[in-house]
Amino acid sequence: MWKRIDHQLKIKAGDGPQAGQFKELGPGREPAVPHPLSLSEFQTVPVFEDISQHVKEVGSQLVKKVNAIFQLDITKDGKTVHQWTIDLKNGSGDTYRGPARLPADTVFTIPEPVFMELILGKMNPQKAFLAGKFKVSGKVLLGQKLERVFKDWAKW
C-alpha cells in the first residue's frame, strides 16, 4: 500500500520484522521522457523572441507603417501549441506570447513547419494561403503588411 508523507514516497512494509513500519523510497524523480510539447522542441520560440527584440528596437516606425494587431496560432498535429501576438497598432509596438489583449485585426492559424518555411523565405505566403497550407481570419490583406515586417526582420 502506498502512502505519501511530506512529499516523499513511502511504502508500508507488511512483511518486515515490525508490522506497520514504513520504508522510505526517496524523493520522486522527474519523468525519463520530457513533456511532448516542451518549448525546446519548437523552432518558432527563438524566432518570435528575435522578432520581439526587433519590434522593441524599431516598433514605433512599424506602428506608423502597419497599424494592425496580428495573432499567430502555431499548430502541431492540428492543435494550437503556441499563440503569439504582434501588436503594431498601439504605443511603440509589442510582441508577446498568448492571445491578443485587444481584438486582433488578423489571426493566422499555421502549422509550425509552414511558418518556418515562410519565415525563411522558402515558401511564398500568397501561394501557401491559396493552397490551404494555413488559415487566415479577419482582415486578410493585412497579411501582406506582416510579410513586409518579417522581411524587414530578416534583413535586421
Curated annotation (Swiss-Prot):
Top-level taxonomic group: Eukaryota
Q: Which gene encodes it?
A: SCP2D1
- What is one term from the GO cellular component aspect held by the record? cytosol
Residue ranges annotated for the SCP2 domain, each copy included:
44-156
Report the SUPFAM superfamilies cross-referenced here: SCP-like
What name does UniProt use for this protein?
A: SCP2 sterol-binding domain-containing protein 1
Q: What lineage does UniProt assign to this protein's organism? A: Eukaryota, Metazoa, Chordata, Craniata, Vertebrata
